[in-house]
């Protein structure tokens, strides 16, 4: 009887853990669905996703005419990296907030943990400026890259 109870408990625990875990690798459609559901935004419409060629290596989304979000894909059409390009007219804080959100969806981290990671990588409004600078930092399974000049700021997060 005890063996039966233990085995049933283990089954329920496995089902619960599998149901709560977030898939670590996913495609564009899943990324967009997560972005829209987690942040209540219309990151991209279903029509855009359905009308996009699935064999592309990257997808680009414009937001507010000043920000370009890119998703880089591997040969299996799973996302291997996310990027954000800001023009000089874009507020750095707004851009970093959007980068935080796309990194949360991409890495599966909570907003609090991802914000701490970006802060530890010095990807903050105090450090990121429209001036010549660049750096790359690897944290766990992800590499964060920042490229800045007088006209734009480019932020990347890739799987290592």
PLM feature segments, named:
Residues 53-96, 131-160:
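Amphipathic N-proximal alpha-helical interface segments
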Residues 41-56, 108-139:
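Short glycine-rich, low-complexity/disordered patches
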Residues 1-5:
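Positively charged n-region of N-terminal signal peptides that target proteins for export
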